Amino acid sequence: MNFIVYPALDIRNGAVVRLQQGDYARQTRYDDQVLPRALAFADSGATWMHLVDLDAAKAGGYTLAPLLRQMTRATGLQVQTGGGVRSRDDVARILDAGAARVVIGSLAVRESARVIEWLQAFGPERITVALDTRQDAGGVWRLPVHGWTEVAEATLDVLAQQYAAAGLRHLLCTDIARDGMLSGPNMDVYTYLRALVPAVQLQVSGGARDVADVVAAKMAGCAGIVLGKALLEGRLALKEAVQQGSVADPSDPLPCGELTEPVCR
């Protein structure tokens, strides 16, 4: 299994932004250089990227299809993208616009039966289910919905197993407490999921801050990591992240001299 580093761009009103813990009122705007940033991702060695339509995530109706077409043609990157996916037609339109995978988040929690139908219709390589989670006082991983203001009845473990049984291949999981905080991913939740649904390829999301976090995700057996704020703020060099993601394979260990310090601790 190749480990994939997904540089991420969240788009709102045509600009690259980041939300802190998913809060639209706590937004940092960077610039409107969306295509140049994607080209820079490709130049740094990335083969995939993660693209989010924040306008659609709030109001529905994916708006980035023209940009997606331009981006895939100009960069050669494979793109997983989502935001506001509400119907099977939405999935089809986004795939037709050039997406390699469509990311489905809120609906995957609220209407899992529908999303499983789409998974089976389009195939497991074309869908990424994204589950945002928060651990409650009792240690249970809950699934907040509706802008994280309500909590779904289903828990993370139940829903992950349901999707795994239906053939899901790609699961992106975000610990809400770490999202946009540059405090490091909560590897406990990913270790838990790896044991629970070992056949699913797991993507780490939320809190990544440096190359050591990339290596930690790889060494934990995850399939990839989404990098957002750390890249935008220059705390992490994408080229180094891609290189480290490719060498830190626990099934093919290299001598310590061939790895950087975080792996050889």
Curated annotation (Swiss-Prot):
Entry EC number(s): 5.3.1.16
GO cellular component terms attached to this protein's record: cytoplasm
Keywords on record: Amino-acid biosynthesis, Cytoplasm, Histidine biosynthesis, Isomerase
Classification via SUPFAM superfamilies: Ribulose-phoshate binding barrel
Native organism: Xylella fastidiosa (strain 9a5c)
Catalysed reactions, semicolon-separated: 1-(5-phospho-beta-D-ribosyl)-5-[(5-phospho-beta-D-ribosylamino)methylideneamino]imidazole-4-carboxamide = 5-[(5-phospho-1-deoxy-D-ribulos-1-ylimino)methylamino]-1-(5-phospho-beta-D-ribosyl)imidazole-4-carboxamide
Name this polypeptide is given: 1-(5-phosphoribosyl)-5-[(5-phosphoribosylamino)methylideneamino] imidazole-4-carboxamide isomerase
Family per similarity comment: Belongs to the HisA/HisF family.
The keyword Transmembrane belongs to this UniProt entry's keyword annotation: no
Localization terms from the record: Cytoplasm
Enzyme class, broadest EC rank: isomerase
Lineage of producing organism: Bacteria, Pseudomonadati, Pseudomonadota, Gammaproteobacteria, Lysobacterales
Entry-linked CDD domains: HisA (cd04732)
Catalytic site positions: D10, D132
Keyword match Cell membrane: no
Short name of one Pfam family: His_biosynth
NCBIfam families, per the entry: 1-(5-phosphoribosyl)-5-[(5-phosphoribosylamino)methylideneamino]imidazole-4-carboxamide isomerase
Gene name linked to the record: hisA
Entry superkingdom: Bacteria
Biological pathway: Amino-acid biosynthesis; L-histidine biosynthesis; L-histidine from 5-phospho-alpha-D-ribose 1-diphosphate: step 4/9
Example GO biological process: L-histidine biosynthetic process
GO MF annotations in UniProt: 1-(5-phosphoribosyl)-5-[(5-phosphoribosylamino)methylideneamino]imidazole-4-carboxamide isomerase activity
Residues forming coiled coils: none
